[in-house]
Amino acid sequence: MAGREGHFRLIAGLGNPGSKYAGTRHNAGFWLVDELVRRYGGELREEPKFRGDCARVLIDGYDCRLVKPMTYMNHSGQAVGALANFFKIPPEAILVAHDEIDLPPGSVRLKRGGGHGGHNGLRHIQSTLGTPDFARLRLGVGHPGHKDQVVPHVLSRPSPDELRQLERAIDDAADQIPRLLAGEWDRACQQLHA
């Protein structure tokens, strides 16, 4: 598969493996990767050396690697770091899709760099890469209202209405991936942040 090198060469969708977590809010990043695989004809394969399920797809002519880390959320950096090291992908060329409790269900926001905001998957990726300088695609799953309820909230399934909102957000985000690969960050932000 030969394609142009896009602005982002690796898209990591965060989540937890296994049927127990399949429909939970914490797996929103997995759902985005699944949608990209569906749209662009890729095939996710277990790649033990990369600690995740990986695919390589062409998106509007851009060669892009996708990964769903199979390390559980708190060790997501193992998969992202392994791929980045092997394929010599700098942090600036990595986009990480993840659930975001600080956004209402159905919201999508792009962010370059910054802190982890208490998200353990981002924390581990930042630690593994040695920098926060990777991009994030934040998929809103809403906040439960109290910090003691955050873990049960993200590890539970969304209501039917929230699920519809999240699915729409994932579609909207997937629609903008070609723009992001083309380096049209501002235009993608305008579409998603509107």
UniProtKB/Swiss-Prot annotation:
TRNA binds at residues 21, 72, 74, 120. Pfam families: Pept_tRNA_hydro. It comes from the Bacteria. The record marks 16 as: Discriminates between blocked and unblocked aminoacyl-tRNA. The record marks 99 as: Stabilizes the basic form of H active site to accept a proton. Keywords: Cytoplasm, Hydrolase, RNA-binding, tRNA-binding. It catalyses: an N-acyl-L-alpha-aminoacyl-tRNA + H2O = an N-acyl-L-amino acid + a tRNA + H(+). Its main location: cytoplasm. The keyword RNA-binding applies. Belongs to the PTH family. NCBIfam families: pth. Hydrolyzes ribosome-free peptidyl-tRNAs (with 1 or more amino acids incorporated), which drop off the ribosome during protein synthesis, or as a result of ribosome stalling. Catalyzes the release of premature peptidyl moieties from peptidyl-tRNA molecules trapped in stalled 50S ribosomal subunits, and thus maintains levels of free tRNAs and 50S ribosomes. This is Peptidyl-tRNA hydrolase. It comes from Halorhodospira halophila (strain DSM 244 / SL1) (Ectothiorhodospira halophila (strain DSM 244 / SL1)). The lineage of its organism: Bacteria, Pseudomonadati, Pseudomonadota, Gammaproteobacteria, Chromatiales. The gene is pth.
